[in-house]
């Protein structure tokens, strides 16, 4: 095993690092440095991820001395809930405040097969997708791994109140996950760890807008995690208009990276395709999309987009959505239409955060 060096700066207050940032092996090493036995790591992880305590003093099978050390070195209240909204369909949306005053969003979605949580990886986003509220205001900073993990913990606490559990995770919230790769990978390892949140790899999905170098790196990780690509256009010209990231890594380079991922992992990918009225939702676009992906092991997820007041795009009519789906199916494409959720609580990425920011500046 690669040796881990744990460097923890014992500051006070909000500057303390989140305990959720530590992977299991890192916690074991920190405990060793403190003169504590390694088995304490299992006990601490149980308190964090099974019992989901909010204070170190609740970890009653630890010595008072160890609890004091934990309080001195780590922060356990990583997120502060600003608002919690529940949609008529059961979707729950959180607006969390971070220690430095920035805010992020997390969404819990109810499905027939269980509950999933959509987590955020950045405060804002630099990629500037023209249809997305997440990019309003640009990128402020990356989240730490612990700030991403804490979103899942808070979501599970909300489910605890209703006697339910979070069964899957989608990394599709605010930000580009591959722009925060250094926090993404520790997050994935902790939520998948059998002593952590213990969510199976095939119940975790990571989505990217198309940061091509990181797709190759992610493929080489050898994970069994689900992989999705925000595609949204069937040709490079239209994609560059909708998604400026395509100017850095044009569609042909993206498709090459996706083929590498499939060859390396043996897993299929999901293409997320948002339908924007009059932009990318015509039958000819569906035909072009079918040609683009005809040799790729994939699934297409059509997304009737939520209206974003700050953007100009309009919703595609229902009959046009079904025509698009039918065209793909006729050409042998595995396709579904995503069920709308949270439409009445601003559940599109970044909308709640944007609304909060707007109210603060009035």
From Swiss-Prot:
InterPro entries linked to this entry: Aldolase_TIM, Methyltransferase_A, RlmN_N, RNA_MTrfase_RlmN, rRNA_lsu_MTrfase_RlmN/Cfr, rSAM
GO molecular function, one term: tRNA (adenine(37)-C2)-methyltransferase activity
Single biological process term from Gene Ontology: tRNA methylation
Keywords recorded for this protein, A-Z: 4Fe-4S, Cytoplasm, Disulfide bond, Iron, Iron-sulfur, Metal-binding, Methyltransferase, rRNA processing, S-adenosyl-L-methionine, Transferase, tRNA processing
Domain Radical SAM core: 111-344
Chief place where the protein resides: cytoplasm
Compartmental location: Cytoplasm
GO cellular component, one term: cytoplasm
Lineage: superkingdom: Bacteria
Binding site for S-adenosyl-L-methionine: 175-176, 207, 230-232, 306
Known catalytic reactions: adenosine(2503) in 23S rRNA + 2 reduced [2Fe-2S]-[ferredoxin] + 2 S-adenosyl-L-methionine = 2-methyladenosine(2503) in 23S rRNA + 5'-deoxyadenosine + L-methionine + 2 oxidized [2Fe-2S]-[ferredoxin] + S-adenosyl-L-homocysteine; adenosine(37) in tRNA + 2 reduced [2Fe-2S]-[ferredoxin] + 2 S-adenosyl-L-methionine = 2-methyladenosine(37) in tRNA + 5'-deoxyadenosine + L-methionine + 2 oxidized [2Fe-2S]-[ferredoxin] + S-adenosyl-L-homocysteine
PROSITE patterns reported for this sequence: RADICAL_SAM
Catalytic residues (positions): 105 (proton acceptor), 349 (s-methylcysteine intermediate)
Cofactor dependency: [4Fe-4S] cluster
Coiled-coil region list: none
Disulfide bonds: 118-349
E.C. code: 2.1.1.192
Free-text remark on how the cofactor is bound: Binds 1 [4Fe-4S] cluster. The cluster is coordinated with 3 cysteines and an exchangeable S-adenosyl-L-methionine.
HAMAP family for this protein: RNA_methyltr_RlmN
Physiological role: Specifically methylates position 2 of adenine 2503 in 23S rRNA and position 2 of adenine 37 in tRNAs.
Note: Reaction proceeds by a ping-pong mechanism involving intermediate methylation of a conserved cysteine residue.
Protein family according to the UniProt entry: Belongs to the radical SAM superfamily. RlmN family.
Annotated protein name in UniProt: Probable dual-specificity RNA methyltransferase RlmN
Organism: Halalkalibacterium halodurans (strain ATCC BAA-125 / DSM 18197 / FERM 7344 / JCM 9153 / C-125)
